[in-house]
UniProtKB/Swiss-Prot annotation:
It is found in: Golgi apparatus membrane; Endoplasmic reticulum membrane. One of its GO terms (cellular component) is endoplasmic reticulum membrane. It comes from Kluyveromyces lactis (strain ATCC 8585 / CBS 2359 / DSM 70799 / NBRC 1267 / NRRL Y-1140 / WM37). Residues 1-226 are cytoplasmic. This is Protein transport protein BOS1. The gene is BOS1.
Length: 248
């Protein structure tokens, strides 16, 4: 239990560090940081579940004169659980703020584009008629406006298109991260179900009088299934990591 507790402490420290960085650099933080926080949250939840299961087993197997030790483990579990809930809530709030800032910037860019187009249209409509006296000045002004338009508008349009591309890329990465997180949660839930089924099956087999050798064979088969499960989980995490590394 101490090893699991130390592992949970490291995960909590990493989570708080990433959340602090995300909060400090809310606008400029890379999308990969959100993926790292989501992955750490899922791993932290898994560690808490394992710690809770070991604590239950400790309560069953320990004697009654270890109340102080039980209280220590219970306090650790409550503290870690509360830290996990707080971190999860803070991450949700930061993602909401991040989305609001992006939406506001996008709206501002659209309004700026509309204002610029309106100004250019008014200039064209309100332009004075050309006279022989002002041909030279008009040609000079027209040339100057053409140069300014050629220098300014393409740059603005390029920045706006680049911003639009980044927004679409961020939205796509958000969907990928959400799918990965949901897949991890589904896998975690399936693992918990398998653990409960294994415990119930073992008890039922003992009640039915099945030999220990048969139960051991069943447990070996379950171990192989768990191994396949953890390999799949590792491949999924690696896939998410490479996606974030490639697009981040």
């Amino acid at each position: 239990m101490n090893a699991l507790y130390n592992h949970a402490i490291k995960q909590r420290s990493l989570l708080n560090k990433d959340l602090g960085k995300f909060e400090k650099e809310l606008v400029t933080a890379p999308i990969s940081l959100q993926g790292a926080i989501a992955t750490t949250l899922v791993s932290f939840e898994k560690t808490l579940h394992q710690y809770k299961e070991q604590y239950k087993q400790y309560q069953i197997n320990s004697s009654d004169d270890n109340d102080e030790t039980k209280l220590k483990y219970e306090t650790r579990l409550q503290t870690l659980t509360q830290d996990y809930e707080d971190a999860k809530e803070k991450f949700t709030e930061l993602k909401q703020k991040y989305s609001e800032i992006n939406a506001r910037d996008q709206l501002f860019n659209q309004q700026a584009s509309m204002v610029e187009e309106t100004v250019m249209n008014k200039r064209n409509i309100n332009a004075p008629p050309q006279t022989s006296f002002g041909i030279g000045a008009l040609d000079q002004n027209s040339e100057r406006m053409t140069i300014n338009s050629a220098a300014g508008l393409p740059l603005y349009e390029g920045l706006r298109k680049e911003n639009s591309i980044f927004e679409r890329g961020n939205a796509h990465l958000d969907r990928i991260l959400q799918m990965g997180q949901e897949s991890l949660e589904d896998i975690m839930e399936q693992n918990r179900v398998l653990q409960r089924l294994q415990s119930q099956m073992t008890k039922s087999l003992h009640v039915l009088g099945v030999s220990n050798e048969t139960i051991e064979k069943i447990n070996k088969r379950l171990f192989k299934d768990k191994l396949i499960f953890y390999i799949g989980l590792l491949l999924l995490i690696l896939g998410i990591y490479f996606v974030l590394k490639w697009f981040g």
